[in-house]
Amino acid sequence: MECDLMETDILESLEDLGYKGPLLDDGALLQAVSAGAASPEFTKLCAWLVSELRVLCKLEENVQATNSPSEAEEFQLEVSGLLGEMNCPYPCLTSGDVTKRLLVQKNCLLLLTYLISELEAARMLCVNAPPKKAQEGGGSEVFQELKGICIALGMSKPPANITMFQFFSGIEKKLKETLAKVPPNHVGKPLLKKSMGPAHWEKIEAINQAIANEYEVRRKLLIKRLDVTVQSFGWSDRAKSQTEKLAKVYQPKRSVLSPKGNISIAHLLAARQDLSKILRTSSGSIREKTACAINKVLMGRVPDRGGRPNEIEPPPPEMPPWQKRQDGPQQQAGGRGGGRGGYEHSSYGGRGGHEQGGRGGRGGYDHGGRGGGRGNKHQGGWTDGGSASGGGYQDGGYRDPGFQPGGYHGGHSSGYQGGGYGGFQTSSYTGSGYQGGGYQQDNRYQDGGHHGERGSGRGGRGGRGGRGGRGSQGGGWGGRGSQTYHQGGQFEQHFQHGGYQYSHSGFGQGRHYTS
Protein backbone atom coordinates (compact mmCIF):
# COMPACT_ATOMS: atom_id res chain seq x y z
CA MET A 1 0.00 0.00 0.00
CA GLU A 2 2.84 2.37 0.88
CA CYS A 3 4.59 1.64 -2.42
CA ASP A 4 1.41 2.40 -4.35
CA LEU A 5 1.11 5.80 -2.69
CA MET A 6 4.75 6.58 -3.40
CA GLU A 7 4.28 5.55 -7.02
CA THR A 8 1.30 7.88 -7.44
CA ASP A 9 3.18 10.82 -5.94
CA ILE A 10 6.21 10.16 -8.13
CA LEU A 11 4.14 10.03 -11.33
CA GLU A 12 2.39 13.30 -10.52
CA SER A 13 5.70 15.00 -9.70
CA LEU A 14 7.31 13.75 -12.90
CA GLU A 15 4.46 15.22 -14.94
CA ASP A 16 4.92 18.56 -13.20
CA LEU A 17 8.65 18.49 -13.86
CA GLY A 18 8.11 17.89 -17.57
CA TYR A 19 9.24 14.28 -17.86
CA LYS A 20 8.06 12.68 -21.13
CA GLY A 21 9.58 9.21 -20.83
CA PRO A 22 7.89 5.81 -21.09
CA LEU A 23 7.64 5.32 -17.32
CA LEU A 24 4.53 7.52 -17.22
CA ASP A 25 2.52 4.63 -18.64
CA ASP A 26 0.38 2.68 -16.23
CA GLY A 27 2.40 0.05 -14.37
CA ALA A 28 5.68 0.88 -16.12
CA LEU A 29 7.22 2.67 -13.16
CA LEU A 30 6.36 -0.07 -10.69
CA GLN A 31 7.86 -2.69 -13.00
CA ALA A 32 11.06 -0.67 -13.44
CA VAL A 33 11.65 -0.10 -9.71
CA SER A 34 11.03 -3.79 -9.02
CA ALA A 35 14.17 -4.60 -11.04
CA GLY A 36 16.01 -1.64 -9.53
CA ALA A 37 19.46 -0.84 -10.87
CA ALA A 38 19.20 -3.79 -13.29
CA SER A 39 16.44 -1.96 -15.23
CA PRO A 40 17.77 0.37 -17.96
CA GLU A 41 14.55 2.43 -17.86
CA PHE A 42 15.02 3.09 -14.14
CA THR A 43 18.62 4.21 -14.69
CA LYS A 44 17.52 6.50 -17.54
CA LEU A 45 14.99 8.20 -15.25
CA CYS A 46 17.64 8.70 -12.57
CA ALA A 47 20.10 10.06 -15.14
CA TRP A 48 17.46 12.55 -16.39
CA LEU A 49 16.78 13.84 -12.89
CA VAL A 50 20.51 14.24 -12.19
CA SER A 51 21.08 16.07 -15.48
CA GLU A 52 18.30 18.54 -14.60
CA LEU A 53 19.88 19.05 -11.19
CA ARG A 54 23.30 19.72 -12.68
CA VAL A 55 21.84 22.58 -14.73
CA LEU A 56 20.72 24.37 -11.58
CA CYS A 57 23.26 23.12 -9.03
CA LYS A 58 27.02 22.88 -9.16
CA LEU A 59 27.49 19.13 -8.88
CA GLU A 60 30.72 17.35 -9.63
CA GLU A 61 29.33 13.84 -9.61
CA ASN A 62 27.27 12.56 -12.51
CA VAL A 63 25.16 9.50 -13.23
CA GLN A 64 25.06 7.72 -16.59
CA ALA A 65 22.21 5.52 -17.77
CA THR A 66 22.87 1.82 -18.37
CA ASN A 67 22.08 -0.27 -21.41
CA SER A 68 22.08 -3.70 -19.80
CA PRO A 69 21.66 -5.26 -16.33
CA SER A 70 25.40 -6.03 -16.20
CA GLU A 71 26.17 -2.34 -15.68
CA ALA A 72 24.12 -2.18 -12.48
CA GLU A 73 27.12 -2.18 -10.12
CA GLU A 74 28.79 0.73 -11.90
CA PHE A 75 25.52 2.68 -11.79
CA GLN A 76 25.16 2.09 -8.05
CA LEU A 77 28.68 3.36 -7.41
CA GLU A 78 27.93 6.56 -9.32
CA VAL A 79 24.70 7.04 -7.36
CA SER A 80 26.52 6.46 -4.07
CA GLY A 81 29.07 9.18 -4.90
CA LEU A 82 26.28 11.59 -5.92
CA LEU A 83 24.30 11.02 -2.72
CA GLY A 84 27.42 11.54 -0.64
CA GLU A 85 28.04 14.89 -2.35
CA MET A 86 24.40 15.95 -1.82
CA ASN A 87 24.41 14.85 1.85
CA CYS A 88 21.46 12.51 1.47
CA PRO A 89 19.66 12.08 4.83
CA TYR A 90 18.40 8.51 4.19
CA PRO A 91 20.71 5.87 5.79
CA CYS A 92 19.33 3.05 3.65
CA LEU A 93 20.68 4.83 0.54
CA THR A 94 24.10 5.79 1.96
CA SER A 95 25.05 2.81 4.14
CA GLY A 96 25.30 -0.92 3.65
CA ASP A 97 26.51 -2.90 0.64
CA VAL A 98 26.82 -0.56 -2.34
CA THR A 99 25.99 -3.25 -4.89
CA LYS A 100 22.73 -4.23 -3.15
CA ARG A 101 21.22 -0.89 -2.10
CA LEU A 102 19.23 -0.26 -5.27
CA LEU A 103 18.01 -3.82 -5.77
CA VAL A 104 15.16 -3.26 -3.28
CA GLN A 105 11.92 -1.75 -4.60
CA LYS A 106 11.34 0.52 -1.60
CA ASN A 107 14.88 1.94 -1.78
CA CYS A 108 14.46 2.69 -5.49
CA LEU A 109 11.20 4.56 -4.85
CA LEU A 110 12.87 6.47 -2.02
CA LEU A 111 15.76 7.44 -4.32
CA LEU A 112 13.36 8.80 -6.94
CA THR A 113 11.43 10.72 -4.27
CA TYR A 114 14.64 12.29 -2.98
CA LEU A 115 15.91 13.31 -6.42
CA ILE A 116 12.50 14.74 -7.40
CA SER A 117 12.24 16.80 -4.21
CA GLU A 118 15.75 18.19 -4.71
CA LEU A 119 14.97 19.13 -8.31
CA GLU A 120 11.71 20.84 -7.33
CA ALA A 121 13.49 22.82 -4.62
CA ALA A 122 16.28 23.83 -7.00
CA ARG A 123 13.78 25.09 -9.58
CA MET A 124 11.88 27.10 -6.98
CA LEU A 125 15.12 28.71 -5.81
CA CYS A 126 16.01 29.49 -9.40
CA VAL A 127 12.67 31.20 -10.01
CA ASN A 128 13.00 33.34 -6.89
CA ALA A 129 16.62 34.22 -7.66
CA PRO A 130 17.29 37.62 -9.28
CA PRO A 131 17.48 37.37 -13.08
CA LYS A 132 20.88 37.37 -14.67
CA LYS A 133 21.89 39.98 -17.18
CA ALA A 134 20.96 39.07 -20.71
CA GLN A 135 23.73 38.36 -23.10
CA GLU A 136 24.57 40.84 -25.82
CA GLY A 137 22.42 40.33 -28.88
CA GLY A 138 19.17 39.65 -27.02
CA GLY A 139 19.96 36.38 -25.25
CA SER A 140 19.73 32.78 -26.35
CA GLU A 141 15.91 32.72 -26.61
CA VAL A 142 15.87 35.69 -29.00
CA PHE A 143 18.69 34.15 -30.97
CA GLN A 144 16.72 30.95 -31.35
CA GLU A 145 13.67 32.88 -32.58
CA LEU A 146 15.70 34.80 -35.17
CA LYS A 147 17.35 31.60 -36.27
CA GLY A 148 13.92 30.03 -36.79
CA ILE A 149 12.84 32.99 -38.95
CA CYS A 150 15.89 32.66 -41.17
CA ILE A 151 15.34 28.93 -41.59
CA ALA A 152 11.61 29.40 -42.39
CA LEU A 153 12.38 32.03 -45.05
CA GLY A 154 15.25 30.02 -46.51
CA MET A 155 17.88 32.64 -45.73
CA SER A 156 21.55 31.82 -45.47
CA LYS A 157 23.52 32.26 -42.27
CA PRO A 158 24.22 35.97 -41.74
CA PRO A 159 27.87 37.09 -41.40
CA ALA A 160 29.32 37.74 -37.96
CA ASN A 161 29.91 41.49 -38.53
CA ILE A 162 26.33 42.30 -39.62
CA THR A 163 24.37 44.93 -37.67
CA MET A 164 20.85 44.48 -36.34
CA PHE A 165 19.46 47.03 -38.80
CA GLN A 166 20.99 45.20 -41.73
CA PHE A 167 19.76 41.88 -40.40
CA PHE A 168 16.12 42.99 -40.04
CA SER A 169 16.25 44.80 -43.39
CA GLY A 170 17.25 41.52 -45.00
CA ILE A 171 14.35 39.72 -43.27
CA GLU A 172 11.86 42.37 -44.51
CA LYS A 173 13.15 42.12 -48.08
CA LYS A 174 12.88 38.35 -48.01
CA LEU A 175 9.29 38.55 -46.65
CA LYS A 176 8.17 40.83 -49.48
CA GLU A 177 9.66 38.47 -52.04
CA THR A 178 7.84 35.52 -50.47
CA LEU A 179 4.47 37.32 -50.26
CA ALA A 180 4.70 38.32 -53.93
CA LYS A 181 4.58 34.64 -54.88
CA VAL A 182 1.23 33.90 -53.12
CA PRO A 183 -2.33 35.08 -54.01
CA PRO A 184 -3.31 38.59 -52.85
CA ASN A 185 -5.75 37.49 -50.12
CA HIS A 186 -3.71 34.50 -49.00
CA VAL A 187 -2.49 36.10 -45.78
CA GLY A 188 -5.02 38.88 -45.25
CA LYS A 189 -4.67 42.25 -43.64
CA PRO A 190 -3.30 42.46 -40.10
CA LEU A 191 -5.73 43.07 -37.27
CA LEU A 192 -3.31 45.37 -35.42
CA LYS A 193 -2.39 48.25 -37.71
CA LYS A 194 -1.12 50.91 -35.29
CA SER A 195 2.54 51.18 -34.48
CA MET A 196 3.52 50.53 -30.86
CA GLY A 197 6.29 51.96 -28.74
CA PRO A 198 8.23 50.27 -25.91
CA ALA A 199 5.74 51.47 -23.26
CA HIS A 200 2.83 50.04 -25.25
CA TRP A 201 4.54 46.67 -25.67
CA GLU A 202 5.18 46.47 -21.92
CA LYS A 203 1.49 47.07 -21.17
CA ILE A 204 0.46 44.52 -23.79
CA GLU A 205 2.83 41.99 -22.26
CA ALA A 206 1.37 42.61 -18.79
CA ILE A 207 -2.17 42.18 -20.11
CA ASN A 208 -1.21 38.97 -21.88
CA GLN A 209 0.40 37.59 -18.72
CA ALA A 210 -2.70 38.36 -16.62
CA ILE A 211 -4.96 36.65 -19.15
CA ALA A 212 -2.59 33.68 -19.37
CA ASN A 213 -2.67 33.24 -15.58
CA GLU A 214 -6.46 33.36 -15.56
CA TYR A 215 -6.81 30.77 -18.30
CA GLU A 216 -4.21 28.55 -16.65
CA VAL A 217 -6.42 28.35 -13.56
CA ARG A 218 -9.40 27.51 -15.74
CA ARG A 219 -7.50 24.79 -17.57
CA LYS A 220 -6.39 23.24 -14.29
CA LEU A 221 -10.00 23.18 -13.13
CA LEU A 222 -11.22 21.51 -16.32
CA ILE A 223 -8.41 18.95 -16.27
CA LYS A 224 -9.12 18.10 -12.63
CA ARG A 225 -12.80 17.65 -13.45
CA LEU A 226 -11.84 15.36 -16.30
CA ASP A 227 -9.61 13.26 -14.02
CA VAL A 228 -12.31 12.95 -11.38
CA THR A 229 -14.94 12.02 -13.94
CA VAL A 230 -12.80 9.32 -15.53
CA GLN A 231 -11.85 8.04 -12.08
CA SER A 232 -15.52 7.75 -11.11
CA PHE A 233 -16.12 5.40 -14.04
CA GLY A 234 -13.92 2.83 -12.34
CA TRP A 235 -15.85 2.63 -9.07
CA SER A 236 -18.26 -0.05 -10.17
CA ASP A 237 -17.34 -3.70 -9.74
CA ARG A 238 -17.57 -4.30 -13.46
CA ALA A 239 -15.19 -1.45 -14.30
CA LYS A 240 -12.59 -2.45 -11.73
CA SER A 241 -11.55 -5.34 -13.93
CA GLN A 242 -11.07 -2.92 -16.84
CA THR A 243 -8.83 -0.46 -15.02
CA GLU A 244 -5.72 -1.27 -17.05
CA LYS A 245 -7.51 -0.94 -20.37
CA LEU A 246 -9.00 2.38 -19.29
CA ALA A 247 -5.59 3.70 -18.25
CA LYS A 248 -3.96 2.69 -21.55
CA VAL A 249 -6.60 4.60 -23.48
CA TYR A 250 -6.84 7.61 -21.20
CA GLN A 251 -3.23 8.32 -20.18
CA PRO A 252 -1.85 9.11 -23.68
CA LYS A 253 -4.64 11.59 -24.31
CA ARG A 254 -4.35 13.02 -20.82
CA SER A 255 -0.61 13.67 -21.12
CA VAL A 256 -1.20 15.95 -24.10
CA LEU A 257 -3.37 18.31 -22.07
CA SER A 258 -1.26 21.08 -20.56
CA PRO A 259 -2.57 23.67 -18.10
CA LYS A 260 -0.30 26.36 -19.51
CA GLY A 261 -1.13 28.13 -22.75
CA ASN A 262 1.32 29.08 -25.50
CA ILE A 263 -0.30 32.35 -26.57
CA SER A 264 2.18 35.23 -26.84
CA ILE A 265 2.43 38.67 -28.42
CA ALA A 266 3.51 36.99 -31.65
CA HIS A 267 -0.01 35.63 -32.01
CA LEU A 268 -1.35 39.18 -31.69
CA LEU A 269 0.90 40.36 -34.49
CA ALA A 270 -0.06 37.38 -36.62
CA ALA A 271 -3.80 37.90 -36.11
CA ARG A 272 -5.70 38.85 -39.25
CA GLN A 273 -9.01 40.55 -39.86
CA ASP A 274 -10.81 37.28 -40.44
CA LEU A 275 -10.67 36.71 -36.66
CA SER A 276 -12.77 39.82 -36.03
CA LYS A 277 -15.79 38.64 -37.99
CA ILE A 278 -18.94 38.43 -35.88
CA LEU A 279 -21.02 35.36 -36.63
CA ARG A 280 -24.65 35.15 -35.63
CA THR A 281 -25.32 31.95 -33.76
CA SER A 282 -29.10 32.18 -34.13
CA SER A 283 -29.38 32.67 -37.88
CA GLY A 284 -31.18 30.12 -40.01
CA SER A 285 -28.10 28.99 -41.88
CA ILE A 286 -26.16 28.44 -38.67
CA ARG A 287 -29.00 26.60 -36.91
CA GLU A 288 -29.27 24.16 -39.79
CA LYS A 289 -25.92 22.73 -38.73
CA THR A 290 -26.29 23.10 -34.96
CA ALA A 291 -29.89 21.94 -34.47
CA CYS A 292 -30.47 18.57 -32.83
CA ALA A 293 -33.45 16.46 -31.86
CA ILE A 294 -33.20 17.18 -28.15
CA ASN A 295 -34.04 20.84 -28.73
CA LYS A 296 -37.52 19.83 -29.89
CA VAL A 297 -38.37 17.93 -26.70
CA LEU A 298 -40.76 19.95 -24.57
CA MET A 299 -41.09 19.52 -20.85
CA GLY A 300 -44.49 18.71 -19.42
CA ARG A 301 -46.43 20.95 -17.13
CA VAL A 302 -44.76 21.18 -13.75
CA PRO A 303 -46.54 22.23 -10.54
CA ASP A 304 -46.08 25.75 -9.31
CA ARG A 305 -43.82 25.73 -6.28
CA GLY A 306 -44.45 29.37 -5.41
CA GLY A 307 -41.79 31.31 -3.61
CA ARG A 308 -42.53 34.68 -5.20
CA PRO A 309 -41.75 37.62 -2.93
CA ASN A 310 -45.14 39.24 -3.46
CA GLU A 311 -46.94 36.06 -2.40
CA ILE A 312 -45.06 35.37 0.81
CA GLU A 313 -46.88 36.35 4.00
CA PRO A 314 -44.90 38.41 6.47
CA PRO A 315 -43.65 36.48 9.50
CA PRO A 316 -45.45 36.97 12.81
CA PRO A 317 -44.02 39.72 14.99
CA GLU A 318 -41.54 38.67 17.60
CA MET A 319 -42.98 41.12 20.12
CA PRO A 320 -46.70 41.76 20.83
CA PRO A 321 -48.00 45.06 19.47
CA TRP A 322 -47.71 47.99 21.78
CA GLN A 323 -50.97 49.16 23.32
CA LYS A 324 -51.78 52.36 25.08
CA ARG A 325 -51.98 51.93 28.81
CA GLN A 326 -55.54 52.13 30.07
CA ASP A 327 -56.14 54.60 32.83
CA GLY A 328 -57.74 53.42 36.04
CA PRO A 329 -61.03 54.75 37.45
CA GLN A 330 -60.97 58.47 38.08
CA GLN A 331 -60.73 59.23 41.78
CA GLN A 332 -60.79 62.53 43.53
CA ALA A 333 -57.54 63.33 45.19
CA GLY A 334 -58.09 63.22 48.90
CA GLY A 335 -55.88 64.04 51.76
CA ARG A 336 -55.06 62.30 54.89
CA GLY A 337 -57.69 62.62 57.54
CA GLY A 338 -57.73 64.37 60.80
CA GLY A 339 -57.01 62.93 64.14
CA ARG A 340 -59.10 60.88 66.38
CA GLY A 341 -61.97 62.65 67.97
CA GLY A 342 -63.87 62.13 71.16
CA TYR A 343 -66.15 59.41 72.26
CA GLU A 344 -67.82 58.56 68.98
CA HIS A 345 -68.76 55.26 67.46
CA SER A 346 -68.61 56.45 63.91
CA SER A 347 -66.64 58.93 61.95
CA TYR A 348 -68.39 61.96 60.63
CA GLY A 349 -65.67 63.45 58.56
CA GLY A 350 -63.77 60.95 56.50
CA ARG A 351 -61.38 61.92 53.74
CA GLY A 352 -62.16 65.06 51.88
CA GLY A 353 -62.58 64.77 48.19
CA HIS A 354 -61.34 68.10 46.90
CA GLU A 355 -60.53 69.79 50.17
CA GLN A 356 -56.95 70.42 50.99
CA GLY A 357 -56.06 70.96 54.57
CA GLY A 358 -53.71 69.95 57.26
CA ARG A 359 -53.62 66.86 59.33
CA GLY A 360 -55.70 66.41 62.42
CA GLY A 361 -54.37 65.23 65.66
CA ARG A 362 -54.98 61.97 67.40
CA GLY A 363 -57.95 62.03 69.70
CA GLY A 364 -58.25 60.66 73.10
CA TYR A 365 -60.63 58.02 74.27
CA ASP A 366 -62.71 57.44 71.20
CA HIS A 367 -64.05 54.50 69.32
CA GLY A 368 -64.59 56.29 66.08
CA GLY A 369 -62.62 56.21 62.91
CA ARG A 370 -60.16 58.69 61.63
CA GLY A 371 -61.26 62.19 61.05
CA GLY A 372 -61.58 64.14 57.87
CA GLY A 373 -58.87 64.25 55.29
CA ARG A 374 -57.33 67.05 53.37
CA GLY A 375 -59.69 69.74 52.30
CA ASN A 376 -59.70 72.19 49.46
CA LYS A 377 -59.64 75.91 49.65
CA HIS A 378 -62.20 77.52 51.87
CA GLN A 379 -63.47 80.63 50.22
CA GLY A 380 -64.69 83.17 52.74
CA GLY A 381 -65.68 83.18 56.36
CA TRP A 382 -64.50 81.07 59.09
CA THR A 383 -65.04 77.38 59.11
CA ASP A 384 -67.78 76.06 61.31
CA GLY A 385 -66.64 73.04 63.16
CA GLY A 386 -63.06 73.42 62.02
CA SER A 387 -60.74 70.49 62.26
CA ALA A 388 -57.57 70.12 64.18
CA SER A 389 -55.58 71.79 61.47
CA GLY A 390 -56.73 74.24 58.89
CA GLY A 391 -55.05 74.78 55.57
CA GLY A 392 -55.53 76.34 52.24
CA TYR A 393 -56.30 79.92 51.43
CA GLN A 394 -58.89 81.88 53.36
CA ASP A 395 -60.03 85.15 51.94
CA GLY A 396 -61.50 86.52 55.12
CA GLY A 397 -62.23 85.89 58.69
CA TYR A 398 -60.22 84.35 61.31
CA ARG A 399 -59.76 80.65 61.52
CA ASP A 400 -58.05 79.05 64.39
CA PRO A 401 -57.59 75.39 65.00
CA GLY A 402 -59.73 74.13 67.79
CA PHE A 403 -58.87 72.29 70.84
CA GLN A 404 -59.51 68.64 71.34
CA PRO A 405 -59.53 67.43 74.87
CA GLY A 406 -57.80 64.18 75.23
CA GLY A 407 -56.70 64.28 71.60
CA TYR A 408 -53.43 64.38 69.84
CA HIS A 409 -52.99 67.66 68.06
CA GLY A 410 -50.49 66.57 65.46
CA GLY A 411 -51.12 68.65 62.38
CA HIS A 412 -49.91 72.06 61.40
CA SER A 413 -51.35 74.48 58.98
CA SER A 414 -49.92 77.41 57.20
CA GLY A 415 -52.61 79.35 55.48
CA TYR A 416 -52.88 82.86 54.25
CA GLN A 417 -55.59 85.00 55.69
CA GLY A 418 -56.52 88.10 53.84
CA GLY A 419 -58.09 89.74 56.83
CA GLY A 420 -57.90 89.19 60.48
CA TYR A 421 -55.77 90.60 63.12
CA GLY A 422 -52.68 92.58 62.46
CA GLY A 423 -49.63 92.79 64.52
CA PHE A 424 -48.79 90.26 67.08
CA GLN A 425 -51.62 88.37 68.59
CA THR A 426 -51.47 85.53 70.96
CA SER A 427 -54.42 83.27 70.57
CA SER A 428 -55.84 80.98 73.14
CA TYR A 429 -53.42 78.62 74.60
CA THR A 430 -54.07 75.25 76.02
CA GLY A 431 -51.22 73.59 77.59
CA SER A 432 -50.18 71.22 80.24
CA GLY A 433 -53.67 69.83 80.49
CA TYR A 434 -53.87 66.31 81.67
CA GLN A 435 -56.42 64.54 79.60
CA GLY A 436 -56.52 61.00 80.74
CA GLY A 437 -52.82 60.61 80.45
CA GLY A 438 -52.73 62.75 77.33
CA TYR A 439 -50.73 65.87 76.80
CA GLN A 440 -51.96 68.69 74.66
CA GLN A 441 -49.96 71.62 73.51
CA ASP A 442 -50.81 74.26 70.99
CA ASN A 443 -48.30 76.81 69.92
CA ARG A 444 -49.70 79.57 67.82
CA TYR A 445 -48.15 82.51 66.16
CA GLN A 446 -49.81 84.96 63.89
CA ASP A 447 -48.08 87.82 62.25
CA GLY A 448 -49.76 90.15 59.83
CA GLY A 449 -52.16 87.71 58.30
CA HIS A 450 -49.77 84.79 58.26
CA HIS A 451 -51.20 82.07 60.41
CA GLY A 452 -48.87 79.35 61.49
CA GLU A 453 -49.57 76.80 64.08
CA ARG A 454 -48.09 73.66 65.36
CA GLY A 455 -49.77 71.42 67.79
CA SER A 456 -48.69 68.32 69.44
CA GLY A 457 -50.29 66.34 72.12
CA ARG A 458 -50.60 62.77 73.06
CA GLY A 459 -54.07 61.53 73.78
CA GLY A 460 -55.12 58.74 75.96
CA ARG A 461 -55.21 55.15 74.91
CA GLY A 462 -58.23 54.26 72.93
CA GLY A 463 -59.29 51.84 70.30
CA ARG A 464 -58.71 52.71 66.68
CA GLY A 465 -61.77 53.36 64.65
CA GLY A 466 -62.23 52.79 60.98
CA ARG A 467 -61.44 55.31 58.32
CA GLY A 468 -64.08 57.86 57.62
CA GLY A 469 -65.65 58.19 54.24
CA ARG A 470 -64.74 60.83 51.69
CA GLY A 471 -66.09 64.23 52.48
CA SER A 472 -67.74 66.51 50.01
CA GLN A 473 -66.17 69.47 48.38
CA GLY A 474 -68.18 72.06 50.22
CA GLY A 475 -68.95 72.45 53.86
CA GLY A 476 -66.94 72.22 56.97
CA TRP A 477 -65.31 69.41 58.76
CA GLY A 478 -67.29 66.88 60.74
CA GLY A 479 -65.61 67.21 64.04
CA ARG A 480 -65.35 64.62 66.71
CA GLY A 481 -64.30 66.50 69.76
CA SER A 482 -63.72 69.56 67.61
CA GLN A 483 -63.92 73.09 68.84
CA THR A 484 -65.77 76.18 67.82
CA TYR A 485 -64.56 79.70 67.90
CA HIS A 486 -67.29 82.22 68.61
CA GLN A 487 -67.43 85.71 67.28
CA GLY A 488 -67.19 87.25 70.71
CA GLY A 489 -63.78 85.73 71.13
CA GLN A 490 -64.92 83.31 73.78
CA PHE A 491 -63.34 79.90 73.50
CA GLU A 492 -65.47 76.96 74.35
CA GLN A 493 -64.50 73.35 74.51
CA HIS A 494 -66.98 70.52 74.34
CA PHE A 495 -67.60 67.33 72.53
CA GLN A 496 -69.98 67.72 69.64
CA HIS A 497 -72.11 64.73 70.24
CA GLY A 498 -75.55 66.15 70.79
CA GLY A 499 -73.94 68.99 72.71
CA TYR A 500 -72.97 66.57 75.43
CA GLN A 501 -69.81 67.19 77.41
CA TYR A 502 -68.18 63.99 78.32
CA SER A 503 -65.78 63.57 81.21
CA HIS A 504 -64.67 60.16 82.17
CA SER A 505 -61.68 58.48 83.79
CA GLY A 506 -59.73 61.59 84.40
CA PHE A 507 -60.77 63.29 81.22
CA GLY A 508 -61.81 66.79 81.89
CA GLN A 509 -61.99 70.07 80.27
CA GLY A 510 -58.76 71.82 79.88
CA ARG A 511 -57.99 75.16 81.28
CA HIS A 512 -58.66 78.17 79.08
CA TYR A 513 -56.23 81.01 78.65
CA THR A 514 -57.39 84.03 76.80
CA SER A 515 -55.37 87.03 76.00
Swiss-Prot record:
Record-stated family: Belongs to the FAM98 family.
Pfam family, one: DUF2465
Natural source organism: Rattus norvegicus (Rat)
Extent of Polar residues compositional bias: 502-515
A GO biological process held by the record: protein methylation
Biased composition (Basic and acidic residues): 302-311, 444-456
Compositionally biased intervals (Gly residues): 382-395, 457-481
Cysteines paired by S-S bonds: none
Region of interest: Disordered: 297-411, 432-515
Stated role: Positively stimulates PRMT1-induced protein arginine methylation. Involved in skeletal homeostasis. Positively regulates lysosome peripheral distribution and ruffled border formation in osteoclasts.
Name of the protein in question: Protein FAM98A
GO MF annotations, alphabetized: protein methyltransferase activity
GO terms under cellular component: tRNA-splicing ligase complex
Subunit description: Interacts (via N- and C-terminus) with DDX1. Interacts (via N- and C-terminus) with C14orf166. Interacts with FAM98B. Interacts with PLEKHM1 (via N- and C-terminus).
Bias (Low complexity): 485-501
